[in-house]
A protein has these predicted regions:
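Extracellular glycan-modifying ectodomains
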Residues: 1-371
Length: 371
């Protein structure tokens, strides 16, 4: 009888253990499948960055450099106030703007369209390394057509070349003889959707990004942020170890992306400067022949070039190019403006400029295009 009683008590316990084990197994299988599926990961990512729950992500709430390091320098991204004046110019709407840009411009720039003097239509084009297709443009000969190339300093010598520059702007008149980027992407999507069920299963089971995705789904949540900050604090305080992709300013108030330092410390030869000037001139003349009324370039300084140029042995890349006697390209010179201002123009925990830096660029854009 005693044996039967024990069995009666043990049996439900075993059942509960199995139920819990199956629940845990199903949970982790579900997480794995979600992390292996592009469509599901896109939805999860969108939810994590929009949600305010403890399971959502705050990785970029304080800037991209904070999200890379969790170093205890953080500033609520976008919370800064504008302290520079907004220059006013007549808005005649007689210009069309084709803007080729990286992450410094784009969405935020387009939202400020009402500040752009004389601009009617904006063609928004991102560089190929941004992995976003652009729509072919059609120049309106009844208006002034302006082309602006904006590029951050660290990318000028490494990613910008004649092939990239002369192919980044697509014209509608070339569509019959060329391939539209959007069509390429659509074809890839169609091809992927036509894969056999077995091929789809293999793609999910052996997804090359699954480890990164799993880490994002499980650990990229607000609930883990205090632990990440504590780990970063311990590593920095007691072991003098920081994330390899960032370094901290001498006054401990700013974080910088490591690539911004290496790009300005590299010694620049006269041959490299002349080669870059020749490239900019070539691109300028190429697009003038394509029908643009004017072509401008704007090199955005790395934050460290403005904030700590002496500490990091700045190679003066921007002034060497902009002051070169052979340069024929009109420049939207934000470097000189930034060097003169007393305003804070960069975020403390992000690679980008803040509202002041952005507004100063808008002011200089309007001034230059209204000369």
């Amino acid at each position: 009888l005693e044996f039967l009683i024990k069995r009666i008590y043990i049996f439900p316990t075993l059942i509960m253990k199995k139920i819990v084990a199956y629940i845990v197994l199903i949970f982790f299988i579900t997480i794995y499948l979600i992390s292996s599926h592009i469509g599901y990961m896109k939805k999860v990512t969108e939810w994590k960055y929009k949600s305010k729950t403890i399971f959502a992500s705050d990785k970029y709430s304080y800037g991209d450099l904070y999200g890379m390091s969790y170093y205890p320098i953080k500033e609520v991204f976008g919370s800064d106030s504008l302290t520079v004046p907004i220059d006013k110019y007549p808005n005649t709407k007689n210009k069309n703007l084709c803007l080729v840009h990286d992450s410094y411009l784009g969405g935020a720039f387009l939202k400020q369209k009402y500040q752009l003097s004389g601009i009617d239509t904006i063609f928004d084009i991102e560089y190929p390394w941004r992995n976003k297709p652009s729509t072919p443009i059609l120049l309106d000969t009844t208006k002034i057509n302006i082309l602006v190339f904006e590029i951050v300093e660290r990318h000028l010598l490494t990613l910008f070349d004649s092939l990239t520059a002369t192919n980044v702007v697509k014209f509608k008149i070339n569509i019959p003889n060329a391939i539209n980027k959007r069509q390429i992407i659509q074809d890839e999507i169609t091809t992927a959707s036509n894969n056999s069920p077995i091929e789809k299963i293999v793609q999910i089971l052996f997804c090359e990004n699954v480890n990164t995705n799993l880490e994002f789904v499980i650990f990229n949540s607000r609930i883990f942020t205090p632990f990440k900050e504590f780990k970063s604090y311990i590593n920095n305080t007691f072991f003098d170890r920081k994330a390899t992709d960032i370094f901290v300013s001498a006054n401990k108030k700013y974080m910088f992306y490591s690539e911004t330092r290496t790009s300005i410390e590299k010694k620049i030869t006269n041959a490299e400067v002349n080669k870059t000037v020749k490239l900019l001139n070539y691109v300028y003349e190429y697009y003038k022949k394509k029908g643009f009324s004017e072509v401008y370039f704007s090199i955005i300084p790395n934050p460290v070039s403005i904030i700590e140029p002496d500490c990091e042995n700045y190679n003066n890349l921007i002034p060497l190019i902009q002051n070169n006697k052979n340069l024929i390209v009109p420049m939207i010179d934000i470097y000189t403006v930034f060097k003169k201002t007393n305003n804070n123009i960069y975020y403390h925990s992000d690679t980008h400029w803040n509202k002041n830096g952005f507004q100063l660029w808008l002011n200089e854009f309007n001034r230059k295009t209204n000369e």
